[in-house]
Amino acid sequence: MRSQLYTGLVLASALVVASPAAAFGQTRSFDVAAQSASTGIVAFARQAGIQIIAPEDATRGRRIVAIRGNLAITDGLRRIATASGLRLVSFDGRTAVLATGAVAASQVSQTDPATPVGVQPETQQASNELDEIVVTGTRARGQTVLTSSSAVTVATREDLDRKAPRSTAQALELIPGVFVEGSGGEVSNNFSVRGLAGGGQQFVQLQEDGLPVFYINALSDTILKQEVSIDRLEAVRSGSSGILTVNGAGATVNFITRKPDFDKSGGTFQLTTSSFGTARVDAFMTKPIAENTAISIGGFYRKDDGIRDPGYDANHGFIFRGAIAQRWTGGKLTLSAKVVDDSNIFYVGIPLTGVGDPKSIPGLSATHGLLQSRDFSLVRTRTSPTTGRSFQPIDLEDGVHTKAQSYGYDLTQDIGSDFNFFARGRYTNFGTDFNSIFSYDNSGLGLASDRLANNPTSAQTLARFVPQGANKLGLRYVDTGQVITGTAALNAINGNGLIAESVIGRNRASVKEFNSDTGITWQTPTNSLTLGGLFTRSSRYNDAIGTATFLTDVQDRARRVDVVALNAANNVVGSLTENGFLTYGTFGEGPSRAKFSSISAYATDQLTLWDKLRIDGGARFEHFVFNRLAGETINRAPIAGSGTYDANGNLLVDNDNIIANNYINNSFAGTYTAQRREFNKVAWTLGANYLITPRLAVYGRYATGFQAQEQNTPTNLRFAEGGVRYSSGFLQASVTGFYTKFLDYPQSRDITSTVGGVQITQQLTANSGIKVYGGEFDVTLRPTTWFRLQASGVIQDSSISIGELIARRNGVVVDLNTIDPALRATVQGFGGNRPERTPALNINVTPAIVLPNNLGEIYGSWKRIGKIYADVSNSLELPAYSVFSAGVLFRLDEAVSLSASVENIGNVIGLTEGNPRGGFVENTGQNTYFARPINGRNAVASVRFDF
């Protein structure tokens, strides 16, 4: 009967030849995925070279967390016991015994270091986040969150499943101190860290398996998606973040993928549906193909209508990845490849009403509506012949279409017992067509009747066509030709009477980039020293050829309208717009080509004293060279065939009586300006962690960092932080106070006006700084076996300081005194304001009822975002909001699990940004405005099969 009791576990490998005492402290390299306890214990035993004995019924229905990295065998056994809820009865250095239930201290081997003195067995039975081994932001082996001297967050696969992020950016909400504007859909979302102004993705470096997706973190989330091939997320804020990676001074977020398994075949197959028409399949499979060789493949395919449905497939495409790994004594090499062909809709700001209390406009839902529609999903816009074409096709149904391939390697090799050499690198070939619309200036949103009666351009249009008999203006729908005129009829359009200017465009970008990290670590029982180098070489192309401003009504799935001149019989005799297009070349046509390289040398060292004090420091020297050829533009160029022009380009005869197709604004001149930036800079950090007891630690850190800004001057940063961490089965808590100073952080806005028919763009750049004081917390409370409460967030106070002002007119530096004095005074008054789109409060609370026998959990989520300001002037306040969500994770057995989540149950209208193209001051005094709300109520459900 005893043989049956321990059936299936575990004579997985040869016995350790070394003495038991040596085995206790022996460090090995582990790569064990999160999985069922019955298979995971086998895999761990094989890699540790020991026996593990446990009753089969004790492991049934239990799971272990991922165990990866270099750590002592006893530390690995602790993690298995902690995560699975088992207890470690004994370990003599060769054989470990696991069982269920409580155990007296006298029953555990007196030589067993797996149970620290003073720690009761029951305190180890719950998964402990602070005991997670981290590899991001450190080179020390076996580094845990508890003993780290940086602000570290680890999110396991289960944490990601519980979060059920609708985008990669939403996964970052698991990190305290990071504010995510997840309202843009799957891609191109904005996020910021520790009080930095929102908008963009600066100062946060997204990594995949320890390497940057891109050196300049833009559109990384088009090829880094949430999928079952992702094993976990690790994040480091400030501190060592700017040492061990490039352009990540504020934070490094590392998504770590599942690796080939040398010990067993297995994988995951997952089917997903949603309330917005998702049909998705995810898969991952790994298989050993020889004793020391293993492969894995994975990826997903999906399509859906989008939470905001444009009337066509919003998201469609796939990612496919594969890897092959070879191991040998003391070393391993993994070769990987990934292919992306994916299209995504990009959600932009929509018209809303109610400043300070946002509400839907009649006909356009703030939670589920959008302007995109089939009416203008496939159009052609006019371009200058100097671009190589006269028309640019724009396909919104193709969306943000990304095609990319990446190829990587990851090599580790032990050299003797104390040294480890590592080399990892990745080449990425990336291309995207960013087909989308964008909100325009807030002044372009208003009543149709007001625009026709009071807009200066409208008056000019009517005067232009008086010789043709025009006596009034009206609107004409492009799709049907219906003409609407008269104040009453115009005010009745869609029940709101509004029309809006938007911009449509197709931004093309391509990137060919290689990133690598190579170094050597010298590890002793009390010290870990790493010397390494980072290298990047990148070639980029970008253009916005074909952008155009157009007019629509305001409704869900809007329709284009023309502004037309009418005669007494209501016949059209002329038009301001062409098929709804008001102007061409809105964002300029100039293409750009850039090449840059970055070479960094870094050193990090961690010294351990008295087994309690860890002192670490690091420095990185970077040599950066950036060269760009930026296409030059001219103010406007005549469109051939539209009319007769004089030698100066002035229109003499309009062939078709359409004003919009006479000229292209900001047209490509066919020439380029050379831009260059070269710098040598050093980032450094010093930190310490003191383990007061096995459960309680304090830490502190100071760091300097910098961020490359392409051809612009790099931004310098300063960080200081200190915190306390506590870890037990009842409570895991990490509380951090921080100070951040962003130096020479430029903020620029364009102000465009028309003088004498000539468009003039005035740009005012403030070389400002930002100071932030704040506190972060990450707490998990487990008062009983069936209840868990997690809370994380940040409370911060950030303010702007204004330095030198630089004025430009149409791109040329001019005397500051030539700029409107009122504008200058206003900008100088921004000092002391809060940075735009930066909340003072950002909190997430997640209570969960844990089902017995490891069946799963039922959880809720409350997110609170404090008020933010849409602009640097703090003139438009976007109010605070709370979002409630809920979900369930349920395991039918070890192989089959179900998950479902409902996001924004209350259908709350929460605004993440105003109108980023609205200038310094967005509040125009109107009650209607552009803003981007979070998505409304939606649900996602999956069934997962592990094998």
Residue ranges and their predicted role:
Residues 511-513, 523-569, 590-742, 782, ...:
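Structural signature of Gram-negative outer-membrane beta-barrels, strongest in the C-terminal barrel
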Residues 41-48, 100-161:
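Short, acidic, small-residue-rich periplasmic hinge/interaction motif at the N-terminus
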Residues 211-237:
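Short acidic/polar hinge/loop motifs at secondary-structure boundaries
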Residues 320, 325-327, 332-408, 433-511, ...:
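Acidic/polar loop-and-plug regions of large Gram-negative outer-membrane beta-barrel proteins
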Residues 110, 119, 124, 766-872, ...:
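Gram-negative outer-membrane beta-barrel transporters
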Residues 96-99, 136-144, 149-152, 169-211, ...:
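Extracytoplasmic beta-strand/coil segments of soluble accessory domains associated
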Residues 25, 202-203, 214-216, 229-232, ...:
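Outer-membrane beta-barrel translocator/receptor signature
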